[in-house]
């Protein structure tokens, strides 16, 4: 992140606030252990997959509607609300550690995820548009993803000693405290894009007419609240329609949406890394360290995203294809039930995970460049929506496949999807702006 100081002062300040927001979002020790937490409270693999699917379904249903909302109202307010709901999720897990409590928590978390998805990216990109600094977007997104992965790694490393000191209760309540801190960082984000939006222009055009001699005597007065509500609904529906048209009707945008959704949604296999480690013979504490190896890979991948933004599509495709091969080999190595193969397997998975992160960040930046309409958050939310479908497919495959295959063999299947994604990149990745 040393190059952050080379950015213009205004962009640097924006980058710092964005990094603080995203960094605190995942500084959660519970991340390393919640799969094991569910298992230790009597839930099987299928039930855990059901919980994860419930999380994704909630975010799926609300994804695009919340994106249009973010194109209509204050994006910062929505991000603050998202942070509060995330904290509520972990409180529910601590006070009601049962299938129902975990399920309710995931529903709340799903709402929080839908409010953030697309909203944060649109807020940052539109702010950069107003500054004439859109080329900084990929770097800032790489730094924010790097901050996320750094804090995830820190949280994972802290999870083991926290668990040893106070069990799941200490891990959970520390996570609640971090979620509250995350809420505070949301207040520091820009309150709105600097550039006037299409919505604001509509507001100017739609100012109510002043009373005049042509007013109808005795006509029922139009209440300001009713008028504002109607205008707000009209703006919302306009943004929803505009974003939907661009996401589905513009070829380069549609392909960018699909590619980003595939690359990001596929990473939901990381929810099973803890269980994969345990299935390979690792203890609970060691499993947290092994998950940390994969996070280290994603951290490096995120930090390299800014440099990789200029790499040709075929180069990115070749890198992702190599990642698919490494992922398959790594997952199968974990299943060998040997300490050496266990660690070697997770190193391979970590490298593959990092490459996937690099390519996914670049794909996200290219998508933002391709969007030309005012409903940026709505279009971005379509990618988030489809990524939830991919995530649901991942959870479904794991739930079904583990009935016949080992965990390691099941996880290895997703390396094949990485190979397919690599073949799609040359034709689906939007061109540089």
How would you describe each model-predicted region?
Residues 1-12, 191-258:
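Juxtamembrane intracellular "pre-TM" segments in multi-pass secondary transporters
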Residues 2-4, 49-51, 60-68, 75-79, ...:
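C-terminal transmembrane bundle of multi-pass solute transporters/carriers
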Residues 3-43, 47, 107, 248-269, ...:
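Pair of pore-lining "gating" transmembrane helices in MFS-fold secondary transporters
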Residues 31, 239, 244-299:
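A single, central transmembrane helix in multi-pass transporters
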Residues 40, 95, 152-175, 278-280, ...:
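Transmembrane alpha-helix termini and helix-breaking/packing motifs in multi-pass membrane transporters
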Residues 127, 175-204, 427-433:
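Helix-loop junctions on the cytosolic side of multi-pass membrane transporters
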